[in-house]
């Protein structure tokens, strides 16, 4: 039983990625994400100018051969700021989701496996977090901590912990009564070994699927908090901050808000397409609905 279960766990991720590779929409999502990630990584070489360099003489220049995406109200090159802004948005999104995934999954597995009063207390706290809309909860936390990169990551991570914990708790409750878990207990395996070697591998694909979907939410939240002034403070280039400046000059300089908005749209679309493909591959019944 144990070897059969291990084989199933090892094969499932392979079949999951094989199914995703056959999905055309997933490839579109991967291409969009690859382009944005490549642009962020290569920003120092792709950016035509320093994103912080000001030139008041060239302020609010429309897209042209000299300034491909125009300039902002301080004469800074929009293309350069867009490329460097991708680095901040992706970094905040990935780190916050990774933090939420590690904490939330661990809490959910322990709560589901232990059960009892501990499970009730944990779920009560999670229900309180889930009662708040993601953006509102992130706004309150960011406002209390202050506007900087570290606090922004903490604020977004806290808003995403509860969903990961719920996803991990449900299979943990089911798996703790399975025969291979009972067999492990009879052989003297401790709770930590059972949770890490038997329960976690059987839910890892669900966690991966959720990570791709909630990463899009984290990037949207980062842009929203930056838009209202609770993200990375200026003069750092952030997509949300660029949209905020563009909103203030929307009648005179449409390009300031349009291009960062399109960048966010491309990333979120790519993540949603990839996440939907992962979800359909891991649960074929969802695609039949």
Predicted regions and their residues:
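Generic hydrophobic transmembrane alpha-helix motif, especially the helices
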Residues: 68, 72, 78, 102-103, ...
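Glycine-rich helix-loop "coupling/hinge" segments at transmembrane-helix boundaries
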Residues: 141-144, 156-157, 171-172, 213, ...
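Gly/Trp-centered helix-boundary motif
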Residues: 1-105, 109-110, 117-120, 131, ...
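Amphipathic alpha-helical segments that mediate coupling or scaffolding at interfaces
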Residues: 19-20, 59, 82-85, 89, ...
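Hydrophobic core positions of alpha-helical segments in small-molecule transporters
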Residues: 28-31, 92-96, 125, 138, ...
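Alpha-helical transmembrane segments of multi-pass membrane proteins
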Residues: 22, 36-40, 80-92, 96, 127-130, 139-143, 156-162, 213, ...
């Amino acid at each position: 039983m144990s070897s059969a279960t291990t084989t199933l766990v090892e094969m499932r991720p392979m079949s999951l990625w094989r199914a995703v590779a056959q999905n055309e929409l997933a490839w579109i999502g991967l291409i969009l994400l690859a382009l944005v990630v490549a642009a962020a990584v290569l920003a120092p070489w792709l950016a035509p100018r320093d994103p912080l360099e000001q030139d008041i003489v060239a302020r609010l220049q429309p897209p042209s051969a000299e300034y491909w995406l125009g300039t902002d109200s301080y004469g800074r090159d929009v293309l350069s700021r867009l490329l460097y802004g991708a680095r901040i948005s992706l970094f905040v999104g990935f780190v916050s989701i990774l933090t939420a995934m590690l904490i939330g999954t661990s809490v959910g597995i322990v709560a589901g496996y232990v059960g009892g009063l501990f499970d009730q207390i944990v779920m009560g706290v999670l229900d309180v977090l889930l009662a708040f809309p993601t953006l509102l909860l992130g706004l309150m936390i960011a406002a209390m901590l202050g506007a900087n990169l570290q606090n922004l990551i903490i604020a977004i991570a806290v808003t995403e912990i509860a969903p990961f914990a719920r996803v991990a708790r449900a299979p943990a409750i089911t798996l703790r009564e399975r025969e291979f878990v009972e067999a492990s207990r009879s052989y003297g395996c401790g709770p930590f070994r059972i949770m890490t070697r038997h329960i976690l591998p059987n839910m890892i694909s669900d966690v991966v699927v959720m990570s791709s979907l909630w990463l899009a939410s984290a990037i949207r939240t980062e842009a929203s908090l930056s838009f209202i002034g609770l993200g990375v403070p200026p003069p750092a280039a952030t997509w949300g901050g660029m949209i905020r400046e563009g909103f203030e000059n929307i009648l005179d300089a449409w390009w300031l808000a349009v291009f960062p908005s399109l960048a966010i749209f491309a990333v979120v679309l790519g993540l949603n397409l990839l996440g939907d493909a992962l979800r359909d591959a891991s649960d074929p019944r969802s695609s039949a609905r």
